[in-house]
Amino acid sequence: MVTRDVVAQGTFDILHPGHVHYLREAKAMGDRLHVIVARSENVTHKAPPVVPDRQRVEMVEALDPVDYARLGHAEDIFVPIEQIEPDVIALGYDQHHEVEGIETALDERGLDCEVRRAGPRKASEDEILSTGSIIEKILDERS
């Protein structure tokens, strides 16, 4: 039997239902889910994580859909992908990565895998699906 490996990646700072939704959808794209947790110093597209790197890996690893979790490479985000050799890279519905850009980088490295984007989770009225929004709410309510 052929096993399909899927890679999901993200910051995963202050876990919320949107993260769980993304990881469940990613897991459904294959058999084994590998999650690459971004190093704090590599998060440049938004505010740096509040939660330390190792703690974020530990929290992600504890989630049911996740088979393996690891910290991303310090210098090259594609190193873990080369090591895992996934069949699918699952992007979150709102992640800043462009599918075409990832596909081009994979082609340049001789990596043959599909790039797919997970769908959004519909938030209920009282649900917060963003780490930034959670932090804002904490600051508002605790100030």
Curated annotation (Swiss-Prot):
A Pfam family recorded for this sequence: CTP_transf_like
Cofactor: a divalent metal cation
Biochemical pathway: Cofactor biosynthesis; FAD biosynthesis; FAD from FMN: step 1/1
Gene Ontology process terms (BP): FAD biosynthetic process; FMN metabolic process
Residue sites binding ATP per the record: T11, F12, H16, P17, G18, H19, D94
Record EC number: 2.7.7.2
Molecular function via GO: ATP binding; FMN adenylyltransferase activity
UniProt keyword ATP-binding, yes or no: yes
Record keyword Metal-binding present: no
InterPro entries in UniProt: Archaeal_FAD_synthase, Cyt_trans-like, FAD_synth_RibL, Rossmann-like_a/b/a_fold
PANTHER family in UniProt: FAD SYNTHASE
Quaternary assembly: Homodimer.
Purpose of the protein: Catalyzes the transfer of the AMP portion of ATP to flavin mononucleotide (FMN) to produce flavin adenine dinucleotide (FAD) coenzyme.
Protein name: FAD synthase
Organism: Halomicrobium mukohataei (strain ATCC 700874 / DSM 12286 / JCM 9738 / NCIMB 13541)
Upper taxonomic lineage: Archaea, Methanobacteriati, Methanobacteriota, Stenosarchaea group, Halobacteria
Gene coding for it: ribL
